[in-house]
Amino acid sequence: MKEAKHLGVDMFLLDDGWFANKYPRQNDKAGLGDWEVTHDKLPNGIPHLVQVAKDAGVKFGIWIEPEMVNPKSELFEKHPDWAIHLPNRETYYYRNQLVLDLSNPKVQDHVFG
């Protein structure tokens, strides 16, 4: 990151793919909703990256999409009822994902808690 700082980079953004262990995020088919660091990809965790960025004088940001879930995720396995389902309609998967029902207090606690 020090080299990036010298090039004028002022923020490091950790994008999609840093999360999920049972179903690691390798593509858009799995892992969304399991917001735990993938140990294989980041063995030192996110705090290490934050410190490296700080030491280099670069801000740190991280991508999340807390309102979405992949059917192939631990979250969906445990709580399939948390995804929005419309009665008498076929389930629609946009990019292999579903929208969590943020009107559900349990979902709110999970996302914002």
Question: What are these model-predicted stretches?
Answer:
Residues 1-113:
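Aromatic-lined carbohydrate-binding/catalytic grooves of carbohydrate-active enzymes
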